[in-house]
Structures are given as structure tokens and as C-alpha cells.
């Protein structure tokens, strides 16, 4: 899922993950773009169909409080989404974790925020991302897991920092928010 900042990549990928989880798939989520607790609040708001702003501010109607309580109970019952704290984790760490997990669907939000501890100092950022993208593709093929990945576009509307991202992906969905 590729788009410019603010175009809704994280929201769309979250909706895909929630749908997969509701269908009984185990989802493992690596939120590199936002803190773990913020991603959890977004999942809760979406599940409760409550505005994010209301949930963040704590100013909720009785109906919204009931919807949140129901969503918490539902999420506990159907705990098919696992958020993984990836603070300081490299691409190698994340890929090893995916390999060990029993999940069906993986969410990486977003690719350009991944770092590769095996990269040499002389490697360009484009080369590092091409390597990460290629390794992710091989991991998906080897494990049979679906890997949903968000990616930024540059100012020219191209996948930022590496053409390999589009070449390695099975499908690329370009997200464009119209004003």
C-alpha cells in the first residue's frame, strides 16, 4: 500500500488486518510508524466505531463508552491481532520473529522505517531498502504468510527510495487522498 504522508495507508492496512482477524486469521503487526499504545487506541477506536479524536481526548458520550467496552470485550475474545513492540528492532530481528510466529498475516507499517543491521556503511539507502524488500518477498514465499506493507511515495509519486519495492511486491495499491 503506497501513498504520500497523510493519504491513509495506515488506516487502509489496519482495515485489511481487522478484516483478516475477523475471518479467523492470526495477524501479527509491526507498527514502526507510531507508538504501540497509539496503534492500540486506533484499533480500539476502529473496532468500536468511535472517532479517534474522541477516544484520545477522553471526551466520550455514554454510547461511545458502551461501544468501547463492547469492543474491548470483543477484542479480548477474538484476540487474533497481536501488536509487536519493535523499538530498536532491525529488519533481521523482525523477519526472524515473523518466521517463528504462527501468524497468517503480517502487517509492516511502514517499509522505509525498517533498518538493516547487516547493511554496510557504504550501502546506499536505496540498496538497503532493496535488500529488505527482497528478503521480505522471500520470507513471504517461504512461509506462505501474507505480508501487507505500507510504503511512502516520493514527491514524484514513485515508491520512495527504491524501485525494488514495486518490483518485489505481488500487488501495489496506490492510495491517493483527494481534497
Indicate where each model-derived feature is located:
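Cytosolic-facing regulatory segments adjacent to core modules
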Residues: 19-102, 116, 157, 166
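DNA replication initiation on ssDNA origins
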Residues: 13
Amino acid at each position: 500500500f503506497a501513498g504520500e504522508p497523510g493519504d491513509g495507508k495506515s488506516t487502509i492496512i489496519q482495515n485489511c488486518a481487522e478484516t483478516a482477524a475477523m475471518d479467523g486469521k492470526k495477524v501479527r503487526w509491526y507498527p514502526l510508524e507510531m507508538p504501540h499504545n497509539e496503534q492500540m487506541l486506533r484499533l480500539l477506536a476502529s473496532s468500536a466505531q468511535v472517532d479517534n479524536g474522541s477516544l484520545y481526548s477522553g471526551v466520550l458520550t455514554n454510547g461511545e463508552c458502551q461501544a468501547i467496552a463492547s469492543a474491548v470485550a470483543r477484542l479480548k475474545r477474538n484476540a487474533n491481532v497481536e501488536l509487536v513492540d519493535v523499538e530498536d528492532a532491525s529488519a533481521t530481528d523482525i523477519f526472524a520473529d515473523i518466521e517463528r510466529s504462527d501468524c497468517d498475516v503480517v502487517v509492516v507499517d511502514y517499509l522505509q522505517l525498517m533498518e538493516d543491521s547487516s547493511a554496510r556503511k557504504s550501502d546506499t539507502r536505496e540498496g538497503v531498502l532493496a535488500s529488505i524488500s527482497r528478503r521480505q518477498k522471500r520470507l513471504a514465499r517461504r512461509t506462505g504468510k501474507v505480508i501487507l506493507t505500507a510504503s511512502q511515495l516520493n514527491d514524484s509519486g514513485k515508491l520512495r527510495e527504491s524501485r525494488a519495492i514495486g518490483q518485489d511486491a505481488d500487488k501495489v495499491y496506490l492510495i491517493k487522498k483527494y481534497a
